[in-house]
Structures are given as C-alpha cells and as structure tokens.
A protein has these predicted regions:
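An N-terminal, well-structured beta->alpha segment
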Residues: 1-65
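Glycine/threonine-rich beta-strand-loop-alpha-helix active-site module
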Residues: 75-175
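N-terminal beta-alpha supersecondary unit
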Residues: 37-46, 70-71, 206, 213
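Carboxylate- and glycine-rich phosphate/diphosphate-binding segment that chelates Mg2+/Mn2+
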Residues: 149-257
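C-terminal catalytic subdomain
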Residues: 257-273
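N-terminal small/polar loop signature for handling phosphorylated ligands or for N-terminal nucleophile
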Residues: 43-115, 229-240
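Short glycine-rich or small-residue beta-strand-to-loop segments that form or flank ligand, phosphate
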Residues: 34-39, 63-66, 92-95, 134, ...
C-alpha cells in the first residue's frame, strides 16, 4: 500500500429541511454580514430570497449577487469580488450548483488576498485560509461543497483554469434534499452522471488511496441505485437525498484522488451523455 494522507476539516449537515439551520451555522462561522452568491435561475424561483430571509430573521445582514453564469468567467469573479468588498460582508454563502460555489471559492481568495484569480492558478498557491464560506448545493453533481477545486473560465486563453488548495474548502456545507426537487429532469440526469464519473475517475486514479476508494465505492453505489428513480421523480426525497450524499462522497473521492476535469464550455455530465 502506498503512503497516503487525508484531512476533511469541514462541518457538514445533511438532512431534509436542513436549510433552516443556515442562521445557526452562519453564527458559528462568526459572521454578521452575509454575501449570498447564486445564479439567476434560483433567484427567479424565489429560493435565494428564502435563504436571505432566513438569515435576516436571525439578525444577519445580507447582500446578494446572482449574476453567475454556467462555467463562470474570470470577469464574473472580478465583479463578484468588487461587490463583496463594496457590501462590507464578512462571510460568504454559496447557494446553487457548481458554478456559484466555484465563484464563491474564488472570491474568498481574491477578496482577502487581492489580485486576479488567475494569479492563484495551479496547486497550493493560496497563501492561507479564505473568507469563511458556507456551501449549499442545489444539485447532486459537482460535489463542490467538499472539494478543494475552483474551476473558472479564462476567455482570454479560451481555457478553464483550476485553483487547487485545501484552503478553499468551504468551512460548512448544508445538504438539504428538498432543494433538489425543482430541477428539470435533464439537469438532474446530467448532474447525476457528472457525480458518478467523478467517483469512477477517482476509483481508477493512480493517486487513489483506500480512503478515496471507500468514498468512491459508496458514491457509485448510491448514485447507481438512485439516479433513474430520481430523474423520473425529482420529488422523491429519499432518492434525492441518496443522490446528494453520493455526490458528496464523489466530491471527497475525486478531490483526494486528484482526477481530470472537463475543459469544454458545457456541463460535464451533459458532455458524457
């Protein structure tokens, strides 16, 4: 057996309706002013407002930034960083799929340490802990709530850059299966395939370890048994929760097994389909 090491220094809450614990978790982070980051689709559905109101009801100030596209760009990170600084917030809530979480991680770096996110491309270039980050996934796909990666599109190079550092791991993650129920079938399918491939790639990686293998095996089991059921009925909370936990385990597995990434400007799972 090759030498390996691992650390999962996060606080993860899993459960139906666990979004209600956001104010409690926010206070644990030590923050009093949230910068809530999401995408326009969730904003239109009223879910961003719901999350913001839960924080406000606990006496926490909130500013929102919802101008985040799929496969987010360096320019979006720059805009979000400027908005964060202008708001005067002291912690970040990433609410959505992989794109808001990737941008939130990047903003956690650039708002604290300055410069462009391009300056942190590569491995272990983030000098220290980022601004406190709470990640709340609304898809079972990227597992970004537990990964040490942020993937951002650099249009000047027509390239997706990757920041890899354990410093950008969200301090807290909330996994509420009820948030998955509004996803269209096509999105649920693509995200589920993305998560399964994360686990599969981690399992066959030359950098795999007994730890990442255990995570990958459980992820493939949960996703394989539940993806068809969930895509057919997104209101099936039991299947949704299994997919969400499978995605979580897959994210941990591929974060530690250091697998490949898709570089085309399309959802990864959709490319595989």
């Amino acid at each position: 057996m090759n030498e390996f090491s691992f650390s999962v220094p996060q606080n993860i809450t899993v459960g139906k309706g666990s979004l209600t614990k956001l104010p409690e978790i926010a206070k644990k982070s030590g923050g009093s002013h949230a910068f809530l980051m999401s995408g326009p689709h969730l904003a239109k559905m009223g879910l961003v407002e719901k999350a913001a109101n839960s924080l406000k009801s606990a006496g926490i100030s909130v500013d929102t930034f919802t101008d985040i596209e799929g496969n987010p760009s360096v320019e979006t990170v720059d805009k979000a960083t400027a908005a964060f600084k202008e708001a005067g917030a002291d912690f970040i809530v990433a609410f959505g799929g992989g794109s808001p979480m990737d941008v939130a991680k990047a903003v956690g770096v650039t708002a604290k340490y300055g410069g462009s996110i391009t300056e942190y491309e590569g491995a272990h270039k983030v000098p220290g802990p980022i601004i406190p980050l709470i990640a709340i996934p609304t898809t079972a796909g990227t597992g970004s709530e537990v990964t040490a990666f942020s993937v951002i599109t650099d249009h000047s190079r027509d390239y997706k850059l990757t920041v890899f550092s354990y410093e950008i791991l969200p301090a807290y993650a909330i996994l509420d299966a009820e948030l998955l129920t509004t996803a269209p079938a096509s999105v649920a399918a693509a995200c589920g395939i993305d998560a399964f491939i994360h686990a599969e790639e981690a399992y066959i990686s030359t950098a795999a370890s007994p730890f990442s293998d255990a995570m990958a095996e459980k992820a493939m089991s949960l996703i394989g048994k539940n993806i068809r059921r969930f895509v057919a009925n997104r209101g099936d909370i039991e299947a949704a929760e299994s997919m969400l936990v499978g995605s979580l385990f897959a994210g941990i597995a591929f974060s530690f097994a250091k697998t490949w990434k898709c570089t085309c400007n399309e959802p990864s799972g959709q490319c595989i389909l």
